[in-house]
Amino acid sequence: MASVLDPVCRHAAATPDNIALRGGADQWTYRQLRDTSVRYAGALAAAGLSPGDRVLLAAPSVPEFVVAYLGIQAAGCVVVPVNTMSTRAEAEYVLGDAGCALAIAWHALGHAVAEAAATLNVPSWTLSPGATVTGAAHAPVVDRDRDETAAILYTSGTTGRPKGAQLTVGNLLSAGEIGAECSSGSSADRTGTGLPLFHVFGQASVMMATLTVGGSMSLLARFDPASMLEMLRRDRLTIMAGVPTMWNAMLHVAGDADPADFAGLRVAVSGGASLPGEIARAFEARFGCTILEGYGLTETTAFGTFNDIDRGGKTGYTGRAVPRLQVQVRDIDGNECPPGTVGEVHIKGPTVMRGYWNRPADTAAVISPDGWFRTGDLGATDTDGDLRIVDRIKDLIIRGGYNVYPGEVEAVLYEHPDIIEAAVIGVPDDHYGEEVAALVAARPGSELGAAEVSSWTRERLSAYKVPRIIRFVDALPKGPSGKILKRSIDRTELTRAPRSATYPRCGTEHPPTGEMCPPQK
């Protein structure tokens, strides 16, 4: 029997005055975090909630999110964190699908959650600064089996309606232990992030890992590169966690910042999307730390592989399986692929979700009877066992019978000094089935044009991988974690767009599907 609150209770007893949370000028000790969380649990129990009841939580990355989250856990209830930008319809869907008994929303948010709750006759609370609740009293922490559901995180819903991934007590506790081990974390560490805690990366890799070792966690309610840089200086961070777009943004505001301001920073943990080598090298050089990339999903409580902190990162790779997990790359027949061969990534271990909420068929489609989870991601290992994520299976572009992995093309685009954001997608094409399209955000003041982008990629990629459609944008759409959202890109206009270059077929040397030659001179 266990509770997600256990690490906090342990440190509150051993080192009660150590700082657990920082949010701007606010600080919370481990004693304060435990006591306030337990009082919050008492208020939930007094309101009639029972263990197993689902509670929706909508709040930014503020200390009060952590209090409410842990209070829900201490009461034995199931937390259902949602995006703070959720519309009324989106909140209503989650409330109904999860069968929530209560909705809690941060005081500064709009009325979407409260209105959705009222529509379904679900009571709603306001989460106020300090996480004060009326009629609150200390209540005993409810222990549960490690395989009981502790949280339901709804996936992004790239196809169909979002599905709720059930993360168990054991999943979350294991994630905290694994995350702490991967970063060699200790109670002396000061971790900072601009990630949303309602996302699995912030929740499992950062929050749970920090609380597991008794370190402190500094939070930004909303990521801003200048604010993140100031937090790094002010709180003397030793660990940062974020996604590639955050590192890129910080590089652009670092300017002539004094390296002494971040002399204590030892590691930056990167995830959520592939980390371009150019960004990794530039960040390490500017901030004097090691940047380590990991790989995981909501359904694996954020963990799968991670670059070993003792041997450093390997550019383009997300490392080996983390402790206690197994990772395999398998072919279409389910056989393990040899090094260098692309296949689907499978993960097994204590962080694999219990299943999708009320969706047994969807669960059976991704979790085998012996516990292996099909990620839907394409990857390959090298001879050292390090994993390279190639792309999502659904993002694969098949142009004239040839596989084009968007991530490979994006990596080449990011090498260009004037490109700060890039996304490569496939669009329907009458001749080749799909055509390669690149959306590019250039550095302010740059005179970069499509011809130069085309030339840059032609020099570095096989002809069939070169984008024939190139569009410039001010910025690419991003999700709450900062990850670029390809599903939000309007493909309609791109489908009608003229191709920027044409390439003759290769005569008798091309296969039936039509290999492409380099341009004729």
List each language-model region with its residue ranges:
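Conserved AMP-binding A3 loop
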Residues: 29-31, 150-174
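AMP-binding/adenylate-forming catalytic core of the ANL superfamily
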Residues: 86, 103, 348-349, 354-355, ...
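Conserved AMP-binding/adenylate-forming core of the ANL superfamily
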Residues: 17-62, 66-70, 87-92
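ANL superfamily adenylate-forming
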Residues: 25, 108-147, 161-162, 253-254, ...
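Conserved ATP/PPi-binding loop(s) of AMP-dependent carboxylate-activating enzymes
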Residues: 320-324, 335-366, 404
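Conserved pre-ATP/AMP-binding loop-to-beta segment of ANL
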Residues: 17, 137-154, 161, 184-190
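Gly/Ser/Thr-rich phosphate-binding loop
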Residues: 237-242, 252-313, 326
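Conserved AMP-binding/adenylation subdomain of ANL enzymes
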Residues: 173-190, 198-239, 253-254
